[in-house]
């Protein structure tokens, strides 16, 4: 099979990378007032340049900035939206792992103004990335519009600003459409919408939580699909857009479980993206049967390599699982990646940077073995 020249690529990765110790120390120093914002930026720039080289040396056709300038994959973007303010207190999201539970506690949000883009979000970050890649396509990740809604729901809206939820949905889609156009003008040709909500909704416990706050949990995924479609319908012709779905990724822990069955038919047949990055590293993700709904022309990037644990997968096992997936969607529509990012938040998952590099190299080598150069 021929080498793909348009994203997503046969060997790809979700986006975030483990933060180097020097960068973590600089963030702590900045928070404590020991260094300036310019000092922190200089460290970020140097470490991002190194991360880009690492990705290109591994053989990847795309490169991100590792999300090194962010505290988390989604909240930095959401806080930067016009109309969104940090509210007193913190959200508490329970994550699970083999040892028990931990909590992710970002600042709560309040929507107290009309949702809009004031300044292009991550513009400087993308411009730096684009200017430093040499062989790879610069890839930018942003949270899906659904993430603005999922955690808080209608309760986070000021009713004086949004007495009608439909106006909120319309403004949210328009803001994202504006951001997509702005990023396109900066030269972005590979944009990814990261979305845990569409994966979480496969879990009955998550749907019960949504129903408990008075929303239609059985149809919310349809609203979310339409929100993304509205945001990307006028995307630049040169821009490939993917979405990444997972069930939570914080310090090697997760939130939800369950296959893609509940959302699969609508998700794969209606969501107008170019490709789907799907978590598939263990039994929590279910089987490949939902892939039967993937139409011709859409790529599925199988997240078979775990980013939660350090153990390196067997190339033979990865090939076998790709062959299993190919029973439901043609092999030519498949690709390979990690199951999620390596560091969705600044804390990162429980593996080393050398182990991260080995996993990226494994993805590249295995994809080359399966699909050729």
Model-derived features: positions:
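Domain-level signal for soluble alpha/beta catalytic cores
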Residues: 1-373
């Amino acid at each position: 099979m021929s080498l793909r020249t348009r994203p997503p690529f046969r060997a790809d990765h979700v986006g975030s990378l483990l933060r180097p110790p020097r960068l973590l120390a600089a963030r702590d120093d900045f928070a404590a007032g020991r260094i300036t914002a310019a000092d922190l930026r200089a460290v970020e720039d140097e470490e991002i340049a190194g991360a880009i080289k690492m990705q290109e040396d591994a053989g990847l056709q795309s490169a991100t900035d590792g999300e090194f300038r962010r505290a988390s994959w989604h909240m930095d973007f959401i806080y930067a939206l016009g109309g969104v303010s940090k509210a007193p207190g913190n959200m508490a999201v329970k994550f699970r792992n083999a040892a028990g539970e931990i909590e992710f506690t970002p600042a709560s949000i309040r929507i107290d103004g009309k949702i809009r883009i004031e300044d292009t979000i991550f513009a400087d970050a993308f411009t730096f990335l684009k200017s430093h890649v040499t062989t790879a396509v610069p890839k930018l990740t942003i949270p899906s519009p659904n993430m603005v809604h999922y955690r808080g729901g209608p309760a986070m809206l000021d009713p004086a600003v949004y007495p009608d939820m439909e106006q909120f949905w319309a403004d949210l889609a328009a803001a994202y459409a504006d951001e997509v156009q702005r990023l396109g003008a900066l030269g972005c040709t590979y944009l990814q919408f990261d979305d845990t909500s569409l994966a979480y909704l496969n879990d009955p416990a998550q749907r019960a939580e949504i129903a408990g706050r008075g929303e239609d949990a059985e149809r919310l995924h349809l609203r979310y699909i339409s929100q993304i479609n509205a945001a990307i319908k006028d995307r630049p012709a040169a821009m490939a857009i993917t979405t990444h779905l997972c069930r939570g990724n914080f310090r090697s822990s997760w939130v939800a479980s369950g296959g893609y069955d509940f959302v699969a038919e609508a998700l794969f047949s209606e969501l107008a993206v170019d490709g789907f990055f799907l978590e598939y590293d263990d039994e929590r993700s279910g089987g490949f049967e939902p892939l039967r709904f993937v139409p011709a022309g859409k790529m599925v990037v199988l997240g078979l390599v775990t980013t939660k644990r350090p153990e390196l997968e067997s190339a033979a096992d990865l090939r076998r699982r790709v062959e299993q997936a190919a029973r439901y969607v043609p092999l030519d529509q498949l690709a390979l990646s990690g199951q999620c990012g390596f560091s969705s938040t600044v804390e990162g998952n429980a593996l080393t940077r050398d182990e991260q590099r080995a996993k990226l190299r494994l993805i590249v080598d295995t994809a080359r073995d399966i699909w050729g150069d």
